[in-house]
Structure formats: C-alpha cells, structure tokens
C-alpha cells in the first residue's frame, strides 16, 4: 500500500492524458494533467522508495497557472507558470529534498505575479539554497543564498544585487 500525501488531495478533480511506462512503484509518466488547481505537463521518472517511505523523482515538469500555494499549503504563494528540471525525493513541502533548475514565467506571491524568474538551487527540509534571478517590471534581482521556511516567518541569509524593487 502506498499512502498518498494529503496535500495531493487538494488537486481535486484530475484529468491526465499521457502514458505510464513501468510498474506501479517505479514508472515514467509523460503527459498532461489538468486539475482543480491548474495544469501540469511532465516527463518524469517516479519511484516509491520503501526505505524512506516516500517518492524519488527525476525529470522535466512544466505548469500553467498551477496553484502551488494551495498544494504546498503556503498562504502567501499563488499560481506558478514554469518549465523546470527536477531531481529529488519527497512530495510534501516538509520532506522534499530536490534540485531544481528552471525558468518561472510567472509566480504569484502576496497578490502579485512576478515574472521572468530563473532558479538554480536545492530545496530540503523547508530550506531553499541557491540562485535566483528576477527580471520583473517591479523587481530586478540577483540573489544567491538561503531562505529558511521552517518558522512562522522566513529567515534569509543571502547576497543580492537589487537594481529595482517596487514592492
């Protein structure tokens, strides 16, 4: 038996068009998923690792207006439109340990959609460590460092060049 994380129930009604190749606990999924929280496209290998009792994954994902805030259960975060390569494990924000390299066309945060974001970093134990470049009309930023989401408020340890910030 494989337990489905509670946050995946937030997907609501799901329509997947694509193919699964492999076994129930080790497969490649490629196709498109429409759900109550948005659209995802994936070409990803997903394995259930019984030692860690979680999923291990590697591949390419893209999304269109996908409500990552609802799935990750982060109130200030909204929808994301992105294309990224990911290599990691864990499907819950609390347990994810993944490397992410991608381009984020749009990311909602505190009721504003930031655009043109490049990300290259790792997410583990509610901690982001990496580089972020933002070329948004309201934010021009080069960021390198850490953001710790473990507490009520994020804790930052970083170096940044901020050319424009109209927040």
Question: Model regions: which residues?
Answer:
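Interface amphipathic segments
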Residues: 1-167
């Amino acid at each position: 038996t494989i337990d489905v994380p509670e946050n995946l129930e937030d997907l609501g009604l799901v329509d997947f068009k694509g193919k699964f190749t492999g076994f129930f606990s080790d497969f490649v999924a490629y196709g498109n998923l429409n759900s109550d929280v948005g659209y995802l496209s994936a070409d990803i290998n997903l394995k259930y690792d019984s030692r860690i009792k979680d999923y291990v994954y590697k591949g390419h994902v893209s999304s269109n207006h996908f409500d990552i805030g609802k799935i990750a259960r982060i109130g200030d975060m909204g929808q994301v439109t992105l294309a990224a390569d990911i290599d990691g494990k864990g499907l819950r924000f609390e347990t994810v340990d993944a490397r992410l390299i991608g381009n984020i066309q749009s990311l909602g945060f505190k009721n504003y959609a930031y655009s043109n974001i490049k990300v290259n970093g790792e997410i583990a134990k509610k901690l982001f460590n990496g580089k972020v470049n933002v070329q948004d009309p309201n934010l021009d930023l080069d960021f390198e460092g850490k953001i710790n989401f473990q507490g009520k408020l994020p804790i930052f340890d970083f170096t940044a060049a901020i050319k424009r910030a109209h927040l």
